[in-house]
């Protein structure tokens, strides 16, 4: 009975976020008049996908709560960074390459989350993987930060 309830909840969550993604994508096509709109809307889609994967992993009981908290901290940090950068006017001209980098980073995070179980099969602990991914994330952040497309133009 418990397995049926969890399975039903997983299906409901997956369907809900598939619909949310379609609505967001349709909305993006209608109102994205400039790159800032695109960045914000694709950011929303990325957040929706992050929630899908966190929910799926949580209901599948593949990870523990501290790992979910770490994912949320990273996600909130990235969102906060983009919002502060927008408010400070650090994106006077958003290049399409920045969007590609952002989407690539989201895809990379998704691959890391999905491959967690495979890494654990080879004997890696969750704590070690979090540290490795945090270091890689930090390196990626500085590469993006130092990129000529994301630096403030003087």
Curated annotation (Swiss-Prot):
GO CC, one annotated term: plasma membrane
Keyword Glycosyltransferase appears in the UniProt entry: no
Localization in the cell: Cell membrane
Membrane topology of the entry: Multi-pass membrane protein
Principal location: membrane
UniProt KW keywords: Cell membrane, Membrane, Transmembrane, Transmembrane helix
Membrane spanning stretches: 39-61, 65-87, 94-113, 128-150
Keyword Magnesium set for record: no
Coiled-coil intervals, chain numbering: none
Protein name: Uncharacterized protein aq_1012
Organismal lineage: Bacteria, Pseudomonadati, Aquificota, Aquificia, Aquificales
């Amino acid at each position: 009975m418990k397995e049926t309830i969890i399975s039903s909840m997983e299906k409901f969550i997956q369907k809900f976020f598939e619909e949310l993604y379609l609505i967001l994508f349709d909305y993006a096509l209608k109102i994205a008049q400039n790159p800032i709109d695109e960045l914000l809307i694709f950011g929303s889609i990325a957040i929706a996908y992050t929630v899908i994967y966190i929910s799926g992993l949580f209901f599948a009981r593949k990870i523990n709560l501290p790992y979910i908290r770490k994912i949320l901290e990273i996600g909130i940090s990235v969102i906060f960074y983009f919002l502060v950068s927008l408010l400070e006017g650090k994106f006077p001209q958003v290049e399409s390459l920045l969007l590609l980098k952002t989407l690539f980073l989201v895809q990379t995070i998704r691959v890391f989350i999905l491959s967690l179980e495979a890494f654990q099969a080879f004997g890696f602990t969750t704590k070690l993987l979090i540290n490795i991914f945090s270091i890689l994330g930090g390196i990626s952040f500085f590469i993006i930060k130092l990129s000529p497309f994301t630096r403030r133009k003087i």
